[in-house]
């Protein structure tokens, strides 16, 4: 019989954490346990977990603190504590519709998968600027259910993984990426290279309310820059396939050309709407992120 652990790494989001813990009590396929690892040395998540236990929870809850500011170490602690033979992961700012876990588990069986990813649906507040709502900046491409996911689209936030794959290493998430991010895609790309079959389930949606702090061009450019750095680092170490020296040179020349072209297109697009210009500016930022790997600079999103 399959057992399911639900893993949450959290950092100073008590209200959001309380909401997702409530969602998990209402799942049509309940988790056997929920593992909450608090990355806040002040233990801000502890009262939330205790309140959930007091109110009643149809699953066991394991709570631990990982005080060092590092998302990789925090996620590694969830894997260490989880006892299920399947591990599902959800972010502490996401909401889980009732059939979510059942859909992930059903997809794992139906497609004979070692891992299943689902969509994260951004919920943009109605008072967001018009150009933000028109730009669809927080959405990611979706695929047909059962499709094997390309390595450059692998990420956490809504994922189910067979525990045996994660337990192959004492530290499945790379601690060196714990302040910059990108540790999730790096891990799944490595598992895929080792033979794990990771597929998409388009029905297993979670919702992510977009926080007010993210409703700005500054945030969009910073996230694009980090995404470009992640992509370049993963590409250069062979996560997307081996690269020879000529391919490496071409990679960076392409990034330079794309950054220059997108700069011009952003200026041309501005009269057509701020959202069009912003889209091209995120392309500029992503390619600058790729180029910045050449001089070793890292944007530390979680520092």
Where would I find each of the regions flagged by the language model?
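N-proximal low-complexity "stem/linker" segments adjacent to membrane-targeting elements
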Residues: 1-26
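Acidic donor-binding segment of Leloir-type glycosyltransferases
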Residues: 21-65
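Glycine-rich, basic loop-to-helix element that forms the pyrophosphate-binding segment
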Residues: 66-82
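Short aromatic/hydrophobic "clamp" motif used to bind/position activated sugar donors
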Residues: 87
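Conserved donor NDP-sugar-binding/catalytic core segment of glycosyltransferases
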Residues: 99-131
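Short, flexible, basic/aromatic active-site loop/helix in glycosyltransferases
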Residues: 118-119, 133-152
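Acidic donor-binding loop at a coil-to-helix junction in glycosyltransferase catalytic cores
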Residues: 178-189
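Non-catalytic, C-terminal membrane-associated alpha-helical segments of glycosyltransferases
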Residues: 222-226, 240-303
């Amino acid at each position: 019989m399959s057992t399911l652990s639900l893993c949450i790494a959290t950092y100073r989001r008590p209200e959001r954490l309380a909401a997702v813990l409530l969602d998990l009590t209402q799942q049509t396929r309940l988790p056997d346990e929920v593992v909450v690892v608090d990355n806040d040395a002040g233990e801000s998540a502890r009262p939330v977990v205790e309140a959930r236990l007091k109110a009643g929870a149809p699953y066991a809850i394991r709570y631990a603190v990982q005080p060092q500011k590092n998302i990789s170490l925090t996620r590694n602690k969830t894997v260490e504590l989880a006892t299920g033979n399947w591990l599902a992961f959800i972010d502490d700012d996401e909401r889980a519709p009732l059939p979510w876990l059942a859909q992930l588990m059903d997809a794992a069986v139906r497609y004979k998968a070692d891992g299943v990813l689902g969509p994260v649906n951004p919920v943009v507040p109605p008072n967001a600027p018009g150009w933000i709502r028109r730009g669809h900046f927080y959405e990611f491409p979706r695929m047909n259910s059962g499709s094997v996911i390309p390595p450059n689209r692998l990420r956490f936030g809504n994922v189910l993984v067979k525990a045996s794959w994660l337990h192959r290493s004492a530290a499945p998430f790379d601690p060196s990426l714990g302040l910059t991010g990108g540790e999730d895609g790096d891990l799944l790309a490595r598992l895929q290279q080792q033979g794990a079959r990771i597929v998409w389930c388009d029905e297993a949606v979670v919702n992510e309310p977009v926080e007010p702090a993210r409703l700005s061009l500054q945030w969009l450019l910073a996230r694009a820059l980090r995404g470009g750095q992640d992509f370049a680092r993963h590409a250069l170490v062979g996560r997307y396939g081996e690269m020879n020296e000529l391919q490496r040179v071409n990679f960076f020349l392409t990034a330079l050309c794309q950054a220059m072209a997108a700069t011009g297109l952003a200026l041309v697009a501005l009269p057509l709407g701020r959202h069009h210009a912003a889209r091209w500016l995120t392309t500029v930022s992503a390619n600058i992120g790729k180029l910045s790997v050449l001089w070793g600079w890292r944007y530390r999103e979680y520092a």
